[in-house]
Amino acid sequence: MNRKKPELLILLKTHWLWIWFWRVTLVVSLSYAWYCFYVPSNRIVWADNYTSAQSQSAQSGKPMILFFTGKWCVPCKVMKRNVWADDQVTKIVNSSFIPLTIDVDDPDHAAILTRYNNDNGVTPITIVTDPNGNALQWRVGGIGKSEFLELLRASNPSAINDL
């Protein structure tokens, strides 16, 4: 009986530490989950499908931007928050490009994945094409705003005059 009493006292003295530990862990975990999965809306005018995007691109002479993504892709969500939602990017993309998102999990996009050598469904991939759909520039993986603007500049220098 005497042995259990000191153990109980030790447990009671350290109990509040464990409560705070789990509270802090919960707050940090929820914050990280919100950061990874929160994606603000953006004002980019996305094309409905590849055929219509290529048709618009051919008629306007503007290059296409293909963004290969998936609902489960955390780096894609970070790009959507940090790159696609940016006002400068929105202005440039809407005025000088035809943007199209391609969900790698959609079976209807299998031909597009094959055409751009993404049969494995790697995400995120950003490809800039000419009006005929030929790849001009591409980046694999999540990229920041400055690298994205350099990608656009390399493929269509006239689109980014004020950088």
Locate predicted features.
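A short beta-strand-turn-helix
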Residues: W46-P63
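Thioredoxin-like thiol-disulfide oxidoreductase module
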Residues: Q54, D87-N156
